Amino acid sequence: MPRWTVSDLDQRPELITSALALFAAGPGHDHLVCGTPARMGQPARADDLRRCLGVALLLEGIRPVGALAICPYSESQVTLWGPAVIAGDRLAGARALLGEVRTALDAGGYESIRVLVDTRNRNARAMVLQLGFTAWKDDLLYETALGERPEADLEGIRVASRADHEAVAAILEEGFPDSDHCNPNLVQREDDGYRHYLLVDAGRPVAAAAVQRDGRRAWLKLISVAGQARGRHHGRRLLLGVMASEVRLGATRMGLDVLADNRAAIALYQGCGFVRQWSATIFTGPV
């Protein structure tokens, strides 16, 4: 029988450094994709674990040999970071961690789970499939160095004030009906570190974006054009304006993720200088 016990980081906060080491590998064949979008592809740090909904730990005696972190996604779904298991029967250890996590998620009213697996990490892919998850779609991570850029046309583009929140929310909710970014409100999102942008053309709000800063990298979470204003290059105009604004605010890079089948968005990002860095498969499963 395994000599494991399952605990959590809240009960054993002194193990945070050991737990963090389990997630240390960067993008590549050992990479475990962080479930917090703005942190994807970044070096793992202690604050990443502290901001998770919970972190289950697999202990062999007093030594952490496995971890599985729960990252927020929506009111009914979470994204897992891991499982990372480094000793013994790794699949059995992963099952022990996932069992504890599923019990906690069920008690919290969650319905489903996402896991992102770097497409180069064959071991993680095999494990996630053996755990019963199903591949859904591929997710692509793009980045661009901001640096010195030609002056963007900033006319009509502004950082949203509270008076703009209704217009921003309407555009983002139309473009991303399954996102809960605007719930309960954009004030809370801005308190969480987001910045919102609005493009106004001929007196009408036509495009909006949500950006999160993480160190020197800005993360484009959402960008959308109002339905009646599409086909007029407002998305490109807003994105270039956002990039110019973020440079002035100290960002040196910008990142984003996009589903591989969203060809229109990919064309926009590539046209604005973004380059694909790596890909992940999104797996889903029930709680």
Range-by-range predicted roles:
Residues 106-118, 247-257:
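Conserved GNAT acetyl-CoA-binding A-motif
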Residues 111, 134, 216, 252, ...:
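Short acidic/polar active-site loop segments enriched in Thr and Asp
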Residues 1-21, 156-168:
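A short beta-loop-alpha structural element at the N-terminal edge
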Residues 115-124, 256-266, 282-287:
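Conserved beta-strand-loop-alpha-helix junction that forms the acyl-donor binding cleft
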Residues 35-96, 209-221, 226-227:
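Conserved donor-binding loop and adjoining core beta-sheet/short helix segment
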Residues 90-103, 130, 225, 231-244, ...:
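Conserved acetyl-CoA-binding loop-helix of GNAT-fold acetyltransferases
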Residues 36-41, 152-218:
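Flexible, substrate/cofactor-facing loop regions flanked by secondary structure
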